[in-house]
Amino acid sequence: MLKHCALALALFAAPAWADEAVPRGTVAFLGLYLMNNEGDADDSDERARVAMARDQIARDLAARGFTLVDTSPVAEKLAQIKNIASCNGCDMALARDLGADYSVTGEIQKTSELILALNLFLRDVDARANLRHGAVDIRGNTDESWSRGYRYLLNNIIFRGEPKP
């Protein structure tokens, strides 16, 4: 009998442990930073993939019901920041200046043509805190591997438990 009560309690309590959906609001998507540890002189392929990933993330956020704000009013400040994903909260200050509820930033770490790490941060501007953060390692430096990596990161880590767009 005690086993059945414990099992029933665990089943009813399980939803409390699940991630809650992120409340929808306005997002300042401030970009992705490419950290190329391989030291390639020509990183034009990666720059094109950063642009592709930026578009993919923006489309995903919009499809999930977030409203992306225009970041052009802070473009000059943004251009002076080396790594927007790691700037001691400057992304949240910029997002606040834009009137956004959240900031979204990311970082790509290229170790070699085979090994890359994708990081994405969703931060609550009012709370001045990380709301969600995810990282995935991908194998292969191709458009397809980057796209799959970000799709996995968004669907299974950042918005885990929420419907896929």
Enumerate the language-model features and the residues they cover.
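C-terminal/domain-edge helix-coil "capping" segments
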Residues: 19-37, 53-56, 60-67, 93-97, ...
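N-terminal signal peptide c-region/cleavage motif recognized by signal peptidases
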Residues: 13-18
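Glycine- and acidic-residue-enriched helix-capping/strand-helix junction motifs
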Residues: 40-52
